[in-house]
């Protein structure tokens, strides 16, 4: 990004926003030129993408980690596969969506889960607002873990309720073999896995790899 020569040094080397200039705006996103002060007192600019739908002091949306639990079955993670025009292909993702006006993250998570997968669940936990791609956008989400009672009659034959223009395929993969199953889908179908999904699968693998073994480091 662009930079200018130092002006007055910023107080205590703290970086801060000076101004934001709108470059272009569409229905869902806008492009801005952000001018800020770096720790040395230089004025710099950054191209930033922001959602037009953001509400004050709330995250933009939610991503749902749906854990499907059934008697005598391994736990499964419910994912969605859909075509993403910016990627030019199909992606595997957690069910996700924007938070509506007056809606809590928990309510948005349950709504999006039912709309995209047909499943009804219960909230297990909700993260604080976390950033998505801070080098590009200010977009934030809550990551909400939801448990699904697969033995419940209402979840026996789930029927998604996609919105206009949404075409979603529901995929359930075993939690204890998630990373390997994702890798197999990538190899077979040449699709892309959302970074949140792949990071979750990696974390499961790392957590299950000799969890009680004390590492021995060589110096």
Swiss-Prot record:
The species is Homo sapiens (Human)
The molecular function terms of the Gene Ontology recorded here are: 8-oxo-dGDP phosphatase activity; ADP-ribose diphosphatase activity; ADP-sugar diphosphatase activity; identical protein binding; magnesium ion binding; nucleotidyltransferase activity; protein homodimerization activity; snoRNA binding
Q: What is the effect of changing residue 84 to Q?
A: Reduces affinity for substrate about 5-fold and reduces catalytic rate 67-fold
User: What protein am I looking at?
Assistant: ADP-sugar pyrophosphatase
PTM comment = Phosphorylation at Thr-45 is required for homodimer stability; dephosphorylation results in destabilization of the homodimer. Dephosphorylation at Thr-45 promotes the ATP-synthesis activity.
Instruction: Cite the effect that the entry attributes to residue 45 to D.
Output: Phosphomimetic mutant; unable to generate ATP in the presence of diphosphate
- Provide the protein's localization: Nucleus
Give the UniProt family note: Belongs to the Nudix hydrolase family.
User: Could you tell me the keywords of this UniProt record?
Assistant: Acetylation, Hydrolase, Isopeptide bond, Magnesium, Metal-binding, Nucleus, Phosphoprotein, RNA-binding, Transferase, Ubl conjugation
Q: Name one GO biological process term.
A: chromatin remodeling
Tissues in which the protein is found: Widely expressed. Most abundant in liver.
């Amino acid at each position: 990004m662009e930079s200018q020569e130092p002006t007055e040094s910023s107080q205590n080397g703290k970086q801060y926003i000076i101004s934001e200039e709108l470059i272009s705006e569409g229905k869902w996103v806008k492009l801005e030129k952000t001018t800020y002060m770096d720790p040395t007192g230089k004025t710099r600019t950054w191209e930033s993408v922001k959602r037009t739908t953001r509400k004050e002091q709330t995250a933009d949306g939610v991503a749902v980690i749906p854990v499907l639990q059934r008697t005598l079955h391994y736990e499964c993670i419910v994912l969605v596969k859909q075509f993403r025009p910016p990627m030019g292909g199909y992606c595997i993702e957690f069910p996700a969506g924007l938070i509506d006006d007056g809606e809590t993250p928990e309510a948005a998570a349950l709504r999006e889960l039912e709309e995209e997968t047909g499943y009804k669940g219960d909230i297990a936990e909700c993260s604080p607002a976390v950033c998505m791609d801070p080098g590009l956008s200010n977009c934030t989400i809550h990551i909400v873990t939801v448990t699904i009672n697969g033995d419940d009659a209402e979840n026996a034959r789930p029927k998604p309720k996609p919105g206009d223009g949404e075409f979603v395929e529901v995929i359930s993969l075993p939690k204890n073999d998630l990373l390997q199953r994702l890798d197999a889908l990538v190899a077979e179908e040449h699709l892309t896995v959302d970074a949140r999904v792949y990071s979750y699968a990696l974390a499961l693998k790392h957590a299950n790899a000799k969890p009680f073994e004390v590492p021995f480091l060589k110096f």
